[in-house]
Design a protein with these regions (language model features):
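Helix-coil boundary and N-terminal low-complexity module in membrane systems
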Residues: 1-131, 135, 141-144, 148, ...
């Protein structure tokens, strides 16, 4: 099962592809692992989703807070593991997906709980606020809408950079916070573009419910996060020296490349 076949990719040259060819190569090659990790991520996000839905249906802000706290405990590690799978794909790290997933969960769950709670609280309040706009007898003012959208964009920009750092590095929360701010300033246009892309994606998913629910198991979380991480990866690697640091710390994760002729020759020798 593969929604992104690699039939139009060029012959292997022993080097990484670039641009759209690289994008479709990774999407096709690692679709099965993305599909599996996506299901686990949806499972981790489900307590938060059901909790927010319940609080909105009951119009209770008091129900929203514990729902976001409990949901964040599961959502934080799940999102960090999703980004871990994506960044392993981006740097061509070897290993079976389930072994890598278990390793990422053990390494990241403690560091991801508090950010997960904060993220879910903020996102939950934004979701509840959106419904108050819908319930209100009058439309909100343009200024209110602008502040709402700006806050949502900044939230998306910040956590688009924060989750990958949990997956990639062992750092303090303060260091990650500083890295996010500095990266957003230096690469503001690219970070803003990726945040807007994610918001447009999720807006479309929400507007076209329940039909888009069919897509959730196949492309729900991983597809847009993979796209955003793919676009940000060159800048993040330049800023944080991702591949250099990981290769030094974990030599076994260094990728191995060979052209098609070398691969065929090696396979023939084995046979």
């Amino acid at each position: 099962m593969n929604l992104f076949p690699n039939c139009n990719l060029p012959a292997g040259t022993g080097r990484r592809l670039t641009g759209s060819q690289r994008y479709w190569e990774l999407a096709g090659r690692d679709f099965k692992r993305f599909f599996a990790v996506n299901l686990l991520t949806l499972l981790g996000l489900s307590p938060f989703g059901f909790g927010v839905l319940l609080s909105i249906l009951s119009s209770s802000i008091l129900a929203l807070i514990p729902a976001c706290v409990i949901g964040g405990i599961a959502a934080g590690p799940a999102l960090s593991c999703m980004h871990d799978a994506i960044f392993r794909s981006l740097r061509d790290a070897p290993g079976a997906w389930f072994e890598n997933y278990k390793r990422a969960w053990k390494q990241n769950w403690r560091q991801a709980i508090i950010p997960g709670i904060i993220f879910c609280l903020l996102l939950g309040f934004y979701s509840f606020m959106l419904m108050t706009f819908w319930w209100a007898s009058r439309l909100p003012s343009p200024g209110t809408v602008a502040v709402y959208v700006l806050g949502l964009v900044l939230l998306t920009m910040f956590f688009s950079l924060y989750w990958p750092q949990i997956a990639l590095f062992e750092q303090s929360g303060k260091q990650r916070f500083q890295n996010c701010l500095l990266f957003m300033i230096r690469y503001f246009g690219k970070t803003l573009g990726c945040a807007l892309l994610q918001l447009l994606y999720w807006t479309a998913m929400i507007l076209f419910l329940p039909w888009t629910s069919i897509l959730l198991p196949f492309a729900g979380v991983w597809f847009i996060l993979f796209t955003a991480d793919f676009l940000l990866y060159p800048a993040m690697d330049e800023a944080f020296q991702i591949e250099e640091q990981i290769t030094k710390a974990f030599p076994e994760q260094a990728p191995f490349y060979e052209d098609d002729e070398a691969w065929l020759e090696r396979k023939q020798k084995k046979e």
